[in-house]
Amino acid sequence: YQAYDRPAFLPVDPEAVRVRVSLSKQRVYVTEGDHMLLVMPVSVGGAATPTPSGHFTIVRKQERRRDHSQGYAYRGNRVKQCLIENRPPGWSFKGAPLPYWCEFKPGYGFHTGWVKHHPCTQGSVRMHENLAPKFFRLVKVGTPVEISYSQPEDANHRMPLPPDAGPLPDYPETMYLGDDYFSRHMTPAYQ
């Protein structure tokens, strides 16, 4: 899983970059006009927490963001995943890391996370840890984002998928408390 990567190209005109998300194929297409800059598999929202469809723009970018409500309660050596309102009395709370956050709607964004072969997020778009830094560099605040059930590019872009992260063991919960998870990303290389 950690070795998975996809080629990416830098744009000639960053103002012409566009992002299209296919919910049915769980794919992101980053384009500059007719030129494909990056095609990547992602995980999108599940049935109960769907990724919103529509036309958006990137409104905020933050390389090291933490969630405000979901995360980890900890006390001494004990750590457990929870919502902030469910943390045990007397325990501290640290929001879940959301590296390479690119927000397109309040509370929704692209970020690093486990990419699974089925819709499974809380509505955001999860990117593979090796592809998130590439995406982050390609988009800017103001980049248009179109999210729909399908995209025209779906018919033309087949790609090998990373192994399904579903059955993989998660990292130790303590990794999410510090900065270790933010440091897992490869330095992006472009064609």
Predicted features along the sequence, with ranges:
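Cell wall/extracellular polymer interaction/catalysis modules
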Residues: 1-76, 80-91, 182
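Exported/periplasmic cell-wall-interacting domains
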Residues: 7, 46, 50-53, 72-191
